[in-house]
């Protein structure tokens, strides 16, 4: 086993993990409870964050995708969730529910937390703009 397991993580993965942490912190500040991070179903996909939102009458299981974009010329971070990516997330969420039947009666929602770096006049990156899109897309009948 390597002395420093972090060496096995690519710089892009390390950066993505930082944005996932920012998103997890933000969502928890909004009252959601984190129950899983980077949940994977081999050969199917990965869900960045799985959280529970407690309501007065019901609980919602939230599957959150975290995205970061550097340039707006290609659309913001939220626009980067293609139909193909949506299908992959939905399929992975179905596997999550099979592995965790304790959440079978929860309503489910797919959210996206996006971070977009604005480029200023100097060409330097400016502070990130973040967005939380609740119910970013719908899944066909479960």
Swiss-Prot record:
Family under the similarity heading: Belongs to the UPF0102 family.
Name used for this protein in its record: UPF0102 protein PsycPRwf_0497
InterPro entries membership: Restrct_endonuc-II-like, tRNA_endonuc-like_dom_sf, UPF0102_YraN-like
SUPFAM superfamilies membership: Restriction endonuclease-like
Molecular function GO labels: nucleic acid binding
Pfam families attached to this UniProt entry: UPF0102 (PF02021)
Signal peptide positions on this chain: none
Cystine residue pairs: none
Stored PANTHER family: UPF0102 PROTEIN YRAN
